[in-house]
UniProtKB/Swiss-Prot annotation:
GO terms for cellular component: chloroplast; plastid; ribonucleoprotein complex; ribosome. The gene is rpl20. This is Large ribosomal subunit protein bL20c. Belongs to the bacterial ribosomal protein bL20 family. Binds directly to 23S ribosomal RNA and is necessary for the in vitro assembly process of the 50S ribosomal subunit. It is not involved in the protein synthesizing functions of that subunit. It comes from Oryza sativa subsp. indica. NCBIfam families: rplT_bact (TIGR01032). InterPro entries: Ribosomal_bL20 (IPR005813), RIBOSOMAL_L20_CS (IPR049946), Ribosomal_protein_bL20_C (IPR035566). Disulfide bonds: none annotated. GO terms for molecular function: rRNA binding; structural constituent of ribosome. GO terms for biological process: ribosomal large subunit assembly; translation. It is found in: Plastid, Chloroplast. The lineage of its organism: Eukaryota, Viridiplantae, Streptophyta, Embryophyta, Tracheophyta. Keywords: Chloroplast, Plastid, Ribonucleoprotein, Ribosomal protein, RNA-binding, rRNA-binding.
């Protein structure tokens, strides 16, 4: 039985997968079946970790704000600060508040004074 040369579509698909696996080692770089498995696994991990990264950074920002509010005695804790911010309609997200709390605590005092003055 003669060998039938296949078209270029499968080669293109495998070359694309191989380009994703260019930094892998051993059989994960050389064998097509292993390449497809490992690339699929890498994509799943990267998607999962992108979602997890958002969660982890939010937790980090909250813990930084909480620590700064307790150390500098701005409020009793994080939840009271956030509650008063929402109550007074001051729109500051947790990332910005965490940067302010770490880099310039004096601005944290001014924010808390704004909240208390509006009361």
């Amino acid at each position: 039985m003669t060998r039938v040369p296949r078209g270029y579509i499968a080669r293109r698909r495998r070359a694309k997968m191989r380009s994703f696996a260019s930094n892998f080692r051993g059989a994960h770089l050389r064998l097509n079946r292993m390449i497809t498995q490992q690339v699929r696994r890498a994509f799943v991990s990267s998607h999962r970790d992108r979602v997890r990264q958002k969660r982890d950074f939010r937790r980090l920002w909250i813990s930084r704000i909480n620590a700064a509010t307790r150390i500098h005695k701005v409020f009793d804790n994080y939840s009271k600060l956030i509650h008063n911010l929402y109550k007074k309609e001051l729109i500051l997200n947790r990332k910005i508040l965490a940067q302010v709390a770490v880099l310039n605590p004096n601005n944290l005092y001014t924010i808390s004074n704004k909240i208390k003055i509006i009361n």
